[in-house]
Amino acid sequence: MAAGGSDPRAGDVEEDASQLIFPKEFETAETLLNSEVHMLLEHRKQQNESAEDEQELSEVFMKTLNYTARFSRFKNRETIASVRSLLLQKKLHKFELACLANLCPETAEESKALIPSLEGRFEDEELQQILDDIQTKRSFQY
């Protein structure tokens, strides 16, 4: 750093998702599942298509829509609401909730590898039961 300069982050805590340490702005933000984002974007696309003065959707919009279509784990509102409700009952941080629902890991070990903040907070059996419940909900969607 140049002499006389100051680091604008000085005094700020270093963010670390593995420790659930996020920037201040994230404290009031809510997380969305990829499936929820997909439904919102699809709705916006349909609105645009049915409008009298249909506008071309941006490249970023279309890329995001395609991404969320590819990585959406849940295909309908009922399943999304059910999975979100299930995960809200657990003592999960909103970041962990979104990660579990978006990634849908199959084992507790895989979950802890992908989401390190789960380590030490959940027993493998408890975490496996959550994952099994999510998988059951996925298997019953249309």
UniProtKB/Swiss-Prot annotation:
Keywords per UniProt: DNA-directed RNA polymerase, Nucleus, Transcription
Keyword Transcription applies: yes
Pfam families: RNA_pol_Rpb4 (PF03874)
GO annotation, biological process: transcription by RNA polymerase II; transcription initiation at RNA polymerase II promoter
Example GO molecular function: nucleotide binding
InterPro entries assigned: HRDC-like_sf, RNA_pol_Rpb4/RPC9_core, Rpb4-like, Rpb4/RPC9, Rpb4/RPC9_sf
Main location: nucleus
One GO term describing the cellular component: nuclear speck
Cellular localisation: Nucleus
Similarity comment text for this entry: Belongs to the eukaryotic RPB4 RNA polymerase subunit family.
Subunit text: Component of the RNA polymerase II (Pol II) core complex consisting of 12 subunits: a ten-subunit catalytic core composed of POLR2A/RPB1, POLR2B/RPB2, POLR2C/RPB3, POLR2I/RPB9, POLR2J/RPB11, POLR2E/RPABC1, POLR2F/RPABC2, POLR2H/RPABC3, POLR2K/RPABC4 and POLR2L/RPABC5 and a mobile stalk composed of two subunits POLR2D/RPB4 and POLR2G/RPB7, protruding from the core and functioning primarily in transcription initiation. Part of Pol II(G) complex, in which Pol II core associates with an additional subunit POLR2M; unlike conventional Pol II, Pol II(G) functions as a transcriptional repressor.
PANTHER family xref list: DNA-DIRECTED RNA POLYMERASE II
Function description: Core component of RNA polymerase II (Pol II), a DNA-dependent RNA polymerase which synthesizes mRNA precursors and many functional non-coding RNAs using the four ribonucleoside triphosphates as substrates. Pol II is the central component of the basal RNA polymerase II transcription machinery. It is composed of mobile elements that move relative to each other. POLR2D/RPB4 is part of a subcomplex with POLR2G/RPB7 that binds to a pocket formed by POLR2A/RPB1, POLR2B/RPB2 and POLR2F/RPABC2 at the base of the clamp element.
Name of this protein: DNA-directed RNA polymerase II subunit RPB4
Organism: Homo sapiens (Human)
Lineage: Eukaryota, Metazoa, Chordata, Craniata, Vertebrata
Gene this chain is encoded by: POLR2D
